Design a protein with these regions (language model features):
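Intrinsically disordered, low-complexity prosegments and terminal tails associated
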Residues: 1-136
């Protein structure tokens, strides 16, 4: 998969959401740096280096927010809790990815990173805010 001048390896993790947009975490074939990339059905792409514990993206119609990132040291599983609802993440090769129903509305919660025994390694606030609307 090519992203600009980058050549990305086969995705480590991938999710489809928002009417066919593909969200992936993949490594740069040359530098091995991880990238979080969204690929629209028309082939247009956007992304950033996946070098933080949490990041995310959504595309029109903003039904689902895709969050992902690197696992903190010692973490083996991830769960996002928003407004009392829990969403377990896919985890592989030190990274995580999860689809969260959003509907372009404000949601507040936390990301929990747990070790193999289910003990909390780290918790971070996780808030989703209404996307800005274009002027009329």
């Amino acid at each position: 998969m090519n992203f600009g001048k980058l050549v990305l390896d086969r995705p480590l993790l991938a999710l489809l959401a928002n009417q066919g947009c593909k969200y992936v975490i993949a490594r740069d074939a040359e530098t091995r740096q991880p990238w979080f990339v969204s690929v629209d059905p028309d082939g247009s792409m956007g992304g950033q280096r996946a070098d933080r514990s949490a990041m995310g993206a959504s595309t029109r119609p903003f039904e689902t927010w895709i969050a992902g990132g690197q696992l903190p040291e010692g973490a083996r599983s991830v769960e996002v809790e928003l407004d009392g609802e829990r969403y377990p993440a896919k985890v592989r090769a030190g990274f995580w990815l999860v689809g969260i129903p959003w509907g372009n509305r404000d949601r507040e919660g936390v990301i929990r990173f747990e070790n193999r025994e289910g003990e909390l390694v780290k918790a971070e606030p996780f808030d989703l805010w209404l996307a800005p609307r274009p002027p009329r």
